[in-house]
Amino acid sequence: MNDIMNQSYRLASGYSMPVLGLGTWQLVGSVCERIVKAAINLGYRHFDTAELYGNEREVGRAIRGVERRELFITSKVSSEHLRANDVISACMGSLRRLQTDYLDLYLIHWPNDEIPLEETMDGMQYLIDEGRVRSIGVSNFDVGRMRDAISAAESPICNNQVE
């Protein structure tokens, strides 16, 4: 397992993402914290959470004590927060809960056809420009929506996470 723990992909943003990560969906409370700590002890450095999961505080407590540069943290903005200002506010909330200054990867959790992707991407770009997010991506986008996201974004879309 150590070999795969040391492998990473180079994202279009130029940053590297570990190939193996721990998803924290459905992990809550002290169970979440214990599992993330155990994963750290096993060598995991990539952790995936989301504002919708309700466990960012627990993930933040679990990663405390690990040098930030050793970690790769992914979080996701929920589909009701895709207006530019809402994207920024949601990210700042995630950062506070995770007790970190930046996210390595920030994803749009689910598409929302009520909000133009251009507006969402304006918020994402602001977060990149301010150093709060290193790479951006999407989750649960079909091919057409992925093309739209690529067209709407100033920075590269580095990931499409499909659940």
What are these regions (language model features)?
Residues 111-163:
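Beta/alpha (TIM)-barrel catalytic core signal, keyed to glycine-rich beta->alpha loops juxtaposed to Asp/Glu
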Residues 59-64, 91-95, 124-125, 146, ...:
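Short, well-ordered amphipathic alpha-helices
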Residues 18-30, 75-85, 114:
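Active-site mouth loops of central-metabolism enzymes
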Residues 22, 39, 47, 59, ...:
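Conserved, mostly hydrophobic/aromatic
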Residues 1-71, 101:
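N-terminal binding-site loop/beta-alpha segment at the start of enzyme catalytic domains
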Residues 87-108, 126-130, 152:
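CE4/NodB-like, metal-dependent polysaccharide N-deacetylase domain
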Residues 27-40, 83-99, 119, 144-147:
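Short, acidic/polar
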Residues 25-27, 50-52, 76-80, 108-111, ...:
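Active-site beta-loop-alpha junctions enriched in small/polar residues
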